């Protein structure tokens, strides 16, 4: 495949800024909150050293933040293409 064709089809993305960081943080927090209540089998792996999150360990944290990053990247690309993030 011609690399120039691939490069020409990549959309313009906004550079890293405070707006981009806030969108990513918000998406990750929403995914963690949703995962806290949606994950049925919890606490099978090692726990994280944070008080008040009994039963929400490292595997759950990695899973929810992975989902949060996927949602955040899609949100940033979408908001960038619409023009709401510069």
Swiss-Prot record:
The transmembrane segments are: 15-34
Q: Where in the cell is it found?
A: Plastid, Chloroplast thylakoid membrane
- PROSITE patterns named among the record's database cross-references: PHOTOSYSTEM_I_PSAGK
Question: What's in the keyword line of the UniProt record?
Answer: Chloroplast, Membrane, Photosynthesis, Photosystem I, Plastid, Thylakoid, Transmembrane, Transmembrane helix
Q: Give Gene Ontology CC terms.
A: chloroplast thylakoid membrane; photosystem I
Q: What is its main location?
A: plastid
The organism's superkingdom is given as: Eukaryota
Listed Pfam families: PSI_PSAK
Kindly list the biological process annotations in GO that this record carries: photosynthesis
Q: Which SUPFAM superfamilies match?
A: Photosystem I reaction center subunit X, PsaK
**UniProt topology in membrane:** Single-pass membrane protein
| The family this protein is said to belong to | Belongs to the PsaG/PsaK family.
Protein name stated in the entry: Photosystem I reaction center subunit PsaK
**What organism does this protein naturally occur in?**
Pyropia yezoensis (Susabi-nori)
């Amino acid at each position: 495949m011609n690399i120039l064709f691939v490069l020409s089809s990549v959309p313009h993305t906004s550079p890293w800024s405070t707006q981009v960081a806030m969108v990513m943080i918000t998406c990750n927090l929403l995914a963690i909150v949703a995962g806290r209540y949606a994950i049925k089998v919890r606490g099978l792996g090692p726990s994280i050293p944070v008080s008040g999150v009994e039963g929400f360990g490292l595997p759950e944290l990695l899973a929810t933040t992975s989902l949060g990053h996927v949602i955040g990247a899609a949100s940033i690309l979408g908001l960038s293409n619409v023009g709401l993030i510069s």
